Amino acid sequence: EDAVAVIANENRYHPICDFLNGLEWDGQERIRFCLHRFLGSDADDYTYEALKLFLLGAISRAFKPGCKFEVMLCLVGGQGAGKSSFFRLLAINDDWFTDDLKKLDDENVYRKMQGHWIIEMSEMIATANAKSIEEIKSFLSRQKETYKIPYETHPADRRRQCVFGGSSNTLDFLPLDRTGNRRFVPVMVYPDRAEVHILDNEEESRAYINQMWAEAMAIYRSGDFKLRFSPTMNEYLKAHQREFMPEDTKAGQILDYLDSYTGNAVCSKQLYREALGHEYDE
């Protein structure tokens, strides 16, 4: 048994790393325009930074399993736009993609993650509530799983080599939460604005995506990146996420007040008077 393990270790290879290492970028920028091209998203700095961060997270997880990366790229809106197809083609090999992660309390959830690089959480995001969002946030924060596979005698730590994408046809999928929604990076899709549908010519779409990975690899090799948003982009994200939360006028007033509040503590009476504009004796 030990001899087999030694021989297997000596002959190990990583197909995803091999794929990424074999890419040569042609120098043409694609990350900035990809989501607009296939899904009609805005080709702005936010969309560029969101997709770039997701790609670099996926690359980092392949080369440095278990590295800290908590971000989920969430594609929102546009039923039939090709959101799930985008994640599938992004994984390059269909075997490296799965959308079979339906429940986080499934005892087989970790086995379903094995061998996959891009994992789409579609139903969980679409039906999320405050409680399930907390579970997803906790799940995204993990850097490893500990479990036993068949024929193993003891559980082992398995560092994550995957990233998670989300998709939702519902706009207000994020609960009102000032503290933890930073993990969710929503990008609105507008299929009627897309240059092409991603499945119109799958061969061309795959070639485009391959070169986008090559561009991301050029950034990765440069070392000039971080696996998180800049402070400026984080502020933009916080404001942008409001568009994907349930409409609640009073909650919005309170959130706006708290965002500009500079004190160390706040009480309910203060919110009642200053955020909502009431008098104490009303």
How would you describe each model-predicted region?
Residues 109-114, 149-167:
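AAA+/SF3 P-loop NTPase mechanochemical coupling elements
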Residues 117-140, 174-180:
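Conserved AAA+/SF3 P-loop NTPase catalytic/coupling segment centered on the Walker-B
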Residues 174-195:
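A short helix-turn-beta junction within AAA+ P-loop NTPase domains corresponding to the substrate/partner-engaging
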Residues 204-241:
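Long, low-complexity, charged/polar intrinsically disordered regions in eukaryotic proteins
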Residues 227-282:
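DNA transaction DNA-binding modules
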Residues 8-114, 267-272, 276:
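P-loop NTPase catalytic core of nucleic-acid-dependent motor ATPases
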Residues 119-122, 148, 161-169, 186-187:
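Structural recognition of the conserved hydrophobic beta-strand(s) that form the central parallel beta-sheet
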Residues 133-156:
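Conserved catalytic/switch belt of AAA+ P-loop NTPases
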